Amino acid sequence: MRKAIVYCHDTEAGLLEESTPGRGYTFTYDKQYMMDRTHDPVSLTMPFREEPYQSGYLFPVFTNMLPEGANRKIVCRSWRLDEKDFFGLLLKIATHDTIGAIIVKEVEF
């Protein structure tokens, strides 16, 4: 199982988990982040709630951060990643200087 902390505007917003590679994902908002109403949800399609969001595919707010087409092939080849490993790719490219307010940092075990 791979995990990543999701930051929104440099504040810890929640935890993204891949339970089954390529098929099972969970996003859980950080309780303190939700309590501060000056913070925004990570996506309009994922409003604040205490229950985890679960999906059979990586949530669109995160897949939209990934390169596409020829750029994806080049990036995956250079990092020796499977082009279908969206979570692995997210962990490599979304750690800093992203377009938008969200960054993602892998939780090391």
Placement of each model-derived feature along the sequence:
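Phosphate/dinucleotide-binding and metal-coordinating scaffold of catalytic cores
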Residues: 1-109
